[in-house]
Regions:
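A short, hydrophobic beta-strand-centered structural micro-motif
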Residues: 37-46
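Charged, amphipathic alpha-helical segments and their flanking helix caps
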Residues: 1-30, 46-137
């Protein structure tokens, strides 16, 4: 029997839903041209199998970009990071039959100033998802 893996679209939608609900800011998968900041932008950077003895699992690595309003100060981007980490301290919600096994904050990967003068941070998360159980007969 073949198991269906979680669609990357479904995972990103679950991340966006949680971030938007708890930060009250938009979380895009593609930022429209000239979109006003502050905002979040989420993208999957890696999908890796992580099967155990009893479960079929994949680890989805997601980079969430925190883009603050233009300012010489970093306070705006720090607030975005703090709000994101607070929002994702709650587990994302996945549809049946998928089960979120683990949601890991891998921390801030980089903070930089874009050409536009906006502060831009990248926060990395891993989502371990079970999509079936291994049964030995």
């Amino acid at each position: 029997m073949a198991y269906q893996k979680l669609s990357p679209v479904t995972l990103i939608a679950a991340v966006q839903d949680k971030v938007e609900a708890l930060t009250e800011l938009r979380c895009y998968d593609h930022v429209p041209l000239n979109e006003a900041s502050p905002l979040y932008f989420a993208e999957i950077t890696r999908i890796q199998p992580a099967n155990s003895k009893t479960m079929y699992r994949d680890v989805y690595s997601v980079a969430i970009h925190c883009i603050a309003e233009e300012s010489p100060s970093s306070v705006g981007v720090y607030n975005l990071i703090e709000n994101l980490q607070s929002a994702l301290s709650e587990d994302i919600t996945l549809p049946e039959p998928f089960e979120l096994v683990m949601q890991t904050d891998n921390g801030v990967q980089t903070i930089k100033t874009d050409e536009s003068g906006e502060k831009h941070a990248i926060v990395s998360y891993d989502f371990t998802v079970c999509y079936g159980f291994i049964c030995k007969l």
